[in-house]
Amino acid sequence: VTGRQADPGSALDELRGEGWQRLLAAARRRLERTGGMLEGAVGLTGPSEAERRVVIGVTGQYRPESVKRLTVDLAALDAALREMHDRSLPTVLAWLHGPLRDRPGERQAEAEQRDQLRATLNAGRHAGESWYATWTEAITGDGTLTRLLRRGDARLVPWAVAVLDRLPVPDDRPPLPLPVLA
């Protein structure tokens, strides 16, 4: 499991083997969960013989056949892949299964977009009225804003606010005809 390989395609094909699959899948989950930080470790419960041999090769430490769980430090896995294939762990994972997701970054961006939608709701002409506050709390509290964001329909919120802004404020103006609101 050591030694540098020249041809990246065929050399990296070994990483699709049984000994590597669960280890690299666990590493991918961990990196996506932490935003790509090479900190901490991943573990394999009930490892196969092939997995045990890979972990021995990566860590340089013998593990008996009776071992129930194997743990590998992500930094050690990254260093081993750099030594063996001249590729970092994130690069190998992207080559095998596509780009890594930055889940913390995605959550942060979604939270910021949700805050912008809330600001749009709060800027509505009727923001001080109880019916509007009830509606705003309902679509904020039941997950509607998040669903709209995730399916790419966030633009509907400003549209809805614009339509509701056309409704008259009591003692403000005469009522608008229904076709104007439609």
Where are the regions that the model predicts?
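Nucleic-acid enzyme cleavage-core boundary/entry regions
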Residues: 1-182
